Amino acid sequence: MFTGIHFIPADTKIGFVRLRTISWVVSALLTIVPLLLVWKVGLNFGIDFQGGTLIEIQTKENVADLGDIRAKVHGLNLGEVQIQEFGAPNDVLIRIAAQPTEKEQQDSIAKVKQVLGDQVEYRRIEVVGPTISSELIAGGTVAVVVAMMAILMYIWFRFEWQFAVAAIASLVHDVTGTIGLYAALQLEFNLSSIAAILTIIGYSLNDKVVIFDRIRENLRKYKKMPLTELLDLSINETLSRTVLTHVTTFLAMMPFVLVGGEAIFGFALAMVWGIVIGAYSSIYVAAPLQLRAARCGGQQRRDRGPSRPGDRANARELCRCVRY
Protein backbone atom coordinates (compact mmCIF):
# COMPACT_ATOMS: atom_id res chain seq x y z
CA MET A 1 0.00 0.00 0.00
CA PHE A 2 1.30 3.46 -0.92
CA THR A 3 1.99 5.40 2.28
CA GLY A 4 3.21 8.62 0.72
CA ILE A 5 6.63 10.07 0.08
CA HIS A 6 8.91 10.34 3.11
CA PHE A 7 11.43 13.16 2.68
CA ILE A 8 12.77 12.52 6.19
CA PRO A 9 13.12 9.01 7.66
CA ALA A 10 10.54 8.24 10.33
CA ASP A 11 13.11 6.65 12.67
CA THR A 12 15.70 9.42 12.95
CA LYS A 13 17.79 9.30 16.12
CA ILE A 14 19.64 12.60 16.13
CA GLY A 15 21.00 13.68 19.52
CA PHE A 16 19.83 17.28 19.44
CA VAL A 17 19.86 17.89 23.19
CA ARG A 18 23.35 16.43 23.53
CA LEU A 19 24.57 19.33 21.41
CA ARG A 20 23.11 21.87 23.82
CA THR A 21 26.54 23.21 24.87
CA ILE A 22 27.24 24.27 21.30
CA SER A 23 23.71 25.57 20.87
CA TRP A 24 24.09 27.72 24.01
CA VAL A 25 27.05 29.49 22.38
CA VAL A 26 25.28 29.96 19.04
CA SER A 27 22.09 31.15 20.73
CA ALA A 28 24.02 33.58 22.93
CA LEU A 29 25.64 35.07 19.82
CA LEU A 30 22.26 35.29 18.05
CA THR A 31 20.92 37.22 21.06
CA ILE A 32 23.86 39.40 22.13
CA VAL A 33 25.14 40.45 18.68
CA PRO A 34 21.74 41.85 17.58
CA LEU A 35 21.48 43.85 20.81
CA LEU A 36 24.97 45.27 20.22
CA LEU A 37 24.02 46.15 16.64
CA VAL A 38 20.90 47.98 17.82
CA TRP A 39 22.97 49.82 20.44
CA LYS A 40 25.92 50.74 18.20
CA VAL A 41 24.35 51.02 14.73
CA GLY A 42 20.71 51.63 15.59
CA LEU A 43 17.56 50.91 13.63
CA ASN A 44 16.61 52.63 10.40
CA PHE A 45 13.23 53.86 11.61
CA GLY A 46 10.71 54.53 8.88
CA ILE A 47 8.35 57.44 8.70
CA ASP A 48 5.85 55.54 10.89
CA PHE A 49 8.17 55.86 13.90
CA GLN A 50 10.24 58.91 12.96
CA GLY A 51 7.58 61.27 11.74
CA GLY A 52 7.87 63.48 8.68
CA THR A 53 6.88 63.29 5.04
CA LEU A 54 7.53 60.53 2.52
CA ILE A 55 7.14 61.18 -1.20
CA GLU A 56 7.60 58.43 -3.78
CA ILE A 57 8.07 59.67 -7.35
CA GLN A 58 8.77 58.12 -10.74
CA THR A 59 10.69 60.11 -13.33
CA LYS A 60 9.90 60.03 -17.02
CA GLU A 61 13.53 59.19 -17.80
CA ASN A 62 14.64 55.57 -17.58
CA VAL A 63 17.21 56.50 -14.93
CA ALA A 64 16.49 59.20 -12.36
CA ASP A 65 19.02 62.01 -11.94
CA LEU A 66 19.40 61.82 -8.16
CA GLY A 67 21.91 64.66 -8.10
CA ASP A 68 19.53 67.07 -9.79
CA ILE A 69 16.59 66.04 -7.58
CA ARG A 70 18.75 66.31 -4.47
CA ALA A 71 19.95 69.80 -5.41
CA LYS A 72 16.42 71.07 -6.03
CA VAL A 73 14.93 69.64 -2.82
CA HIS A 74 17.86 70.62 -0.57
CA GLY A 75 17.53 74.17 -1.87
CA LEU A 76 14.13 74.41 -0.17
CA ASN A 77 15.74 74.39 3.31
CA LEU A 78 13.24 71.90 4.75
CA GLY A 79 15.65 70.45 7.29
CA GLU A 80 16.94 66.89 7.06
CA VAL A 81 16.09 65.37 3.68
CA GLN A 82 16.96 61.89 2.40
CA ILE A 83 16.74 61.03 -1.30
CA GLN A 84 17.37 57.50 -2.54
CA GLU A 85 16.60 55.17 -5.40
CA PHE A 86 13.64 52.94 -4.62
CA GLY A 87 13.20 49.76 -6.66
CA ALA A 88 13.43 50.62 -10.36
CA PRO A 89 16.17 53.05 -11.56
CA ASN A 90 13.58 55.77 -12.20
CA ASP A 91 11.80 55.37 -8.84
CA VAL A 92 12.92 57.81 -6.14
CA LEU A 93 11.99 58.05 -2.46
CA ILE A 94 12.13 61.47 -0.78
CA ARG A 95 12.02 61.66 3.04
CA ILE A 96 11.57 65.02 4.71
CA ALA A 97 12.02 65.51 8.45
CA ALA A 98 8.97 66.33 10.54
CA GLN A 99 8.02 70.02 10.42
CA PRO A 100 6.91 71.99 13.50
CA THR A 101 3.26 72.21 12.43
CA GLU A 102 0.89 70.31 10.19
CA LYS A 103 0.54 73.36 7.92
CA GLU A 104 4.30 73.51 7.42
CA GLN A 105 4.34 69.82 6.53
CA GLN A 106 1.69 70.40 3.87
CA ASP A 107 3.64 73.43 2.64
CA SER A 108 6.78 71.31 2.31
CA ILE A 109 4.92 68.92 -0.01
CA ALA A 110 3.70 71.83 -2.13
CA LYS A 111 7.25 73.22 -2.38
CA VAL A 112 8.64 69.86 -3.51
CA LYS A 113 5.95 69.56 -6.17
CA GLN A 114 6.72 73.07 -7.33
CA VAL A 115 10.46 72.54 -7.83
CA LEU A 116 10.08 69.11 -9.44
CA GLY A 117 7.28 70.23 -11.72
CA ASP A 118 5.37 67.88 -13.99
CA GLN A 119 8.44 65.90 -15.02
CA VAL A 120 7.72 63.29 -12.36
CA GLU A 121 4.75 61.14 -11.35
CA TYR A 122 3.80 61.26 -7.67
CA ARG A 123 3.05 57.66 -6.73
CA ARG A 124 2.76 57.96 -2.95
CA ILE A 125 2.68 60.73 -0.36
CA GLU A 126 2.58 59.97 3.37
CA VAL A 127 2.65 62.42 6.27
CA VAL A 128 3.12 61.38 9.90
CA GLY A 129 3.33 63.95 12.68
CA PRO A 130 5.73 63.60 15.64
CA THR A 131 2.88 62.93 18.07
CA ILE A 132 1.47 60.11 15.95
CA SER A 133 4.93 58.58 15.43
CA SER A 134 5.60 58.47 19.19
CA GLU A 135 2.19 56.85 19.71
CA LEU A 136 3.01 54.25 17.07
CA ILE A 137 6.31 53.42 18.79
CA ALA A 138 4.53 52.97 22.12
CA GLY A 139 1.74 50.95 20.51
CA GLY A 140 4.16 48.67 18.67
CA THR A 141 6.17 48.02 21.84
CA VAL A 142 3.02 47.31 23.84
CA ALA A 143 1.78 44.91 21.14
CA VAL A 144 4.95 42.81 21.32
CA VAL A 145 5.03 42.80 25.15
CA VAL A 146 1.33 41.90 25.44
CA ALA A 147 1.79 39.09 22.92
CA MET A 148 4.68 37.70 24.98
CA MET A 149 2.70 37.87 28.23
CA ALA A 150 -0.33 36.20 26.64
CA ILE A 151 1.90 33.41 25.33
CA LEU A 152 3.46 32.98 28.78
CA MET A 153 0.05 32.56 30.40
CA TYR A 154 -1.18 30.23 27.64
CA ILE A 155 1.81 27.89 27.83
CA TRP A 156 1.79 27.97 31.64
CA PHE A 157 -1.90 27.06 31.71
CA ARG A 158 -1.68 24.35 29.03
CA PHE A 159 1.60 22.78 30.16
CA GLU A 160 3.61 24.08 33.14
CA TRP A 161 6.04 26.79 34.11
CA GLN A 162 9.08 24.90 32.74
CA PHE A 163 7.52 24.88 29.27
CA ALA A 164 6.44 28.53 29.60
CA VAL A 165 9.95 29.66 30.52
CA ALA A 166 11.44 27.71 27.62
CA ALA A 167 8.88 29.09 25.16
CA ILE A 168 9.28 32.74 26.19
CA ALA A 169 13.09 32.57 26.27
CA SER A 170 13.22 31.02 22.80
CA LEU A 171 10.73 33.57 21.43
CA VAL A 172 12.82 36.42 22.86
CA HIS A 173 15.74 34.79 21.03
CA ASP A 174 13.71 34.88 17.78
CA VAL A 175 12.61 38.50 18.25
CA THR A 176 16.08 39.84 19.07
CA GLY A 177 17.53 37.92 16.14
CA THR A 178 14.96 39.45 13.78
CA ILE A 179 15.50 42.97 15.10
CA GLY A 180 19.24 42.40 14.68
CA LEU A 181 18.62 41.64 11.00
CA TYR A 182 16.99 45.05 10.58
CA ALA A 183 19.93 46.73 12.32
CA ALA A 184 22.61 44.81 10.39
CA LEU A 185 21.10 45.43 6.94
CA GLN A 186 19.63 48.84 7.85
CA LEU A 187 16.23 47.76 6.55
CA GLU A 188 13.46 50.26 7.15
CA PHE A 189 11.84 49.52 10.52
CA ASN A 190 8.18 50.47 10.34
CA LEU A 191 4.73 49.13 11.21
CA SER A 192 5.23 46.28 8.72
CA SER A 193 8.26 45.25 10.76
CA ILE A 194 6.11 45.00 13.90
CA ALA A 195 3.64 42.89 11.91
CA ALA A 196 6.51 40.65 10.78
CA ILE A 197 7.75 40.21 14.36
CA LEU A 198 4.27 39.34 15.66
CA THR A 199 3.79 36.88 12.79
CA ILE A 200 7.14 35.25 13.53
CA ILE A 201 6.18 34.95 17.21
CA GLY A 202 2.92 33.18 16.36
CA TYR A 203 4.50 30.96 13.73
CA SER A 204 7.42 29.95 15.94
CA LEU A 205 5.14 29.36 18.94
CA ASN A 206 2.98 26.97 16.93
CA ASP A 207 6.02 24.82 16.18
CA LYS A 208 7.14 24.83 19.81
CA VAL A 209 3.68 23.81 21.03
CA VAL A 210 3.75 20.79 18.70
CA ILE A 211 7.09 19.68 20.17
CA PHE A 212 5.96 20.41 23.74
CA ASP A 213 2.81 18.37 23.18
CA ARG A 214 4.89 15.40 22.02
CA ILE A 215 7.15 15.80 25.06
CA ARG A 216 4.09 15.75 27.33
CA GLU A 217 2.78 12.63 25.58
CA ASN A 218 6.13 10.85 25.91
CA LEU A 219 6.44 11.84 29.57
CA ARG A 220 3.34 9.77 30.25
CA LYS A 221 4.40 6.97 27.94
CA TYR A 222 8.06 6.47 28.93
CA LYS A 223 8.20 6.97 32.66
CA LYS A 224 11.68 5.46 33.07
CA MET A 225 13.41 7.09 30.11
CA PRO A 226 16.10 9.69 30.98
CA LEU A 227 14.85 13.18 30.24
CA THR A 228 17.64 13.94 27.76
CA GLU A 229 16.74 10.88 25.70
CA LEU A 230 13.04 11.64 25.96
CA LEU A 231 13.53 15.18 24.63
CA ASP A 232 15.61 13.86 21.73
CA LEU A 233 12.94 11.26 20.98
CA SER A 234 10.19 13.89 20.99
CA ILE A 235 12.10 16.22 18.67
CA ASN A 236 12.93 13.38 16.27
CA GLU A 237 9.31 12.23 16.20
CA THR A 238 8.18 15.72 15.15
CA LEU A 239 11.21 16.45 12.95
CA SER A 240 9.49 15.64 9.67
CA ARG A 241 6.60 17.98 10.44
CA THR A 242 8.97 20.74 11.62
CA VAL A 243 11.24 20.61 8.58
CA LEU A 244 8.52 20.26 5.95
CA THR A 245 6.39 23.04 7.44
CA HIS A 246 9.30 25.47 7.57
CA VAL A 247 10.61 24.53 4.12
CA THR A 248 7.22 24.99 2.44
CA THR A 249 6.68 28.35 4.15
CA PHE A 250 10.23 29.38 3.26
CA LEU A 251 9.64 28.55 -0.40
CA ALA A 252 6.34 30.44 -0.35
CA MET A 253 8.01 33.60 1.01
CA MET A 254 11.10 33.61 -1.24
CA PRO A 255 9.27 35.00 -4.33
CA PHE A 256 8.26 38.03 -2.26
CA VAL A 257 11.91 38.57 -1.34
CA LEU A 258 13.18 38.16 -4.90
CA VAL A 259 10.51 39.88 -7.01
CA GLY A 260 8.05 41.40 -4.54
CA GLY A 261 9.49 44.89 -4.81
CA GLU A 262 10.91 47.33 -2.28
CA ALA A 263 7.57 47.96 -0.58
CA ILE A 264 7.40 44.49 0.99
CA PHE A 265 11.08 43.47 0.80
CA GLY A 266 11.81 44.19 4.46
CA PHE A 267 8.72 42.34 5.66
CA ALA A 268 9.37 39.33 3.41
CA LEU A 269 13.07 39.08 4.31
CA ALA A 270 12.24 39.30 8.03
CA MET A 271 9.71 36.50 7.59
CA VAL A 272 12.24 34.28 5.78
CA TRP A 273 14.82 34.93 8.49
CA GLY A 274 12.20 34.33 11.19
CA ILE A 275 11.28 30.97 9.65
CA VAL A 276 14.92 29.86 9.79
CA ILE A 277 15.67 31.14 13.28
CA GLY A 278 12.31 29.87 14.56
CA ALA A 279 13.07 26.34 13.36
CA TYR A 280 16.47 26.51 15.05
CA SER A 281 15.09 27.80 18.35
CA SER A 282 12.33 25.17 18.45
CA ILE A 283 14.93 22.41 18.38
CA TYR A 284 18.09 23.84 19.93
CA VAL A 285 16.74 26.46 22.35
CA ALA A 286 13.27 25.53 23.63
CA ALA A 287 13.94 21.86 24.42
CA PRO A 288 17.33 22.36 26.16
CA LEU A 289 15.84 25.23 28.17
CA GLN A 290 12.96 22.99 29.21
CA LEU A 291 15.53 20.46 30.43
CA ARG A 292 17.43 23.15 32.35
CA ALA A 293 14.24 24.56 33.88
CA ALA A 294 13.11 21.10 34.99
CA ARG A 295 16.44 20.45 36.68
CA CYS A 296 16.55 23.85 38.33
CA GLY A 297 13.07 23.14 39.67
CA GLY A 298 14.33 20.01 41.39
CA GLN A 299 12.50 17.71 38.99
CA GLN A 300 15.40 15.69 37.59
CA ARG A 301 14.74 12.69 35.46
CA ARG A 302 16.79 9.51 35.69
CA ASP A 303 19.81 10.61 33.66
CA ARG A 304 21.85 8.57 36.14
CA GLY A 305 20.26 5.27 35.16
CA PRO A 306 16.92 3.51 35.64
CA SER A 307 18.09 1.25 38.45
CA ARG A 308 18.19 3.93 41.13
CA PRO A 309 15.63 3.44 43.95
CA GLY A 310 14.21 6.92 43.50
CA ASP A 311 13.76 6.69 39.74
CA ARG A 312 10.06 5.83 39.74
CA ALA A 313 9.29 8.59 42.25
CA ASN A 314 11.24 11.10 40.14
CA ALA A 315 9.28 10.03 37.07
CA ARG A 316 5.97 10.58 38.85
CA GLU A 317 7.16 13.95 40.13
CA LEU A 318 8.15 15.16 36.68
CA CYS A 319 4.98 13.83 35.07
CA ARG A 320 2.94 15.83 37.57
CA CYS A 321 4.46 19.00 36.11
CA VAL A 322 2.47 18.33 32.93
CA ARG A 323 -1.25 19.09 33.04
CA TYR A 324 -3.61 16.67 31.31
Residue ranges, per PLM feature:
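A structural signal for conserved, well-ordered secondary-structure elements
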Residues: 1-324
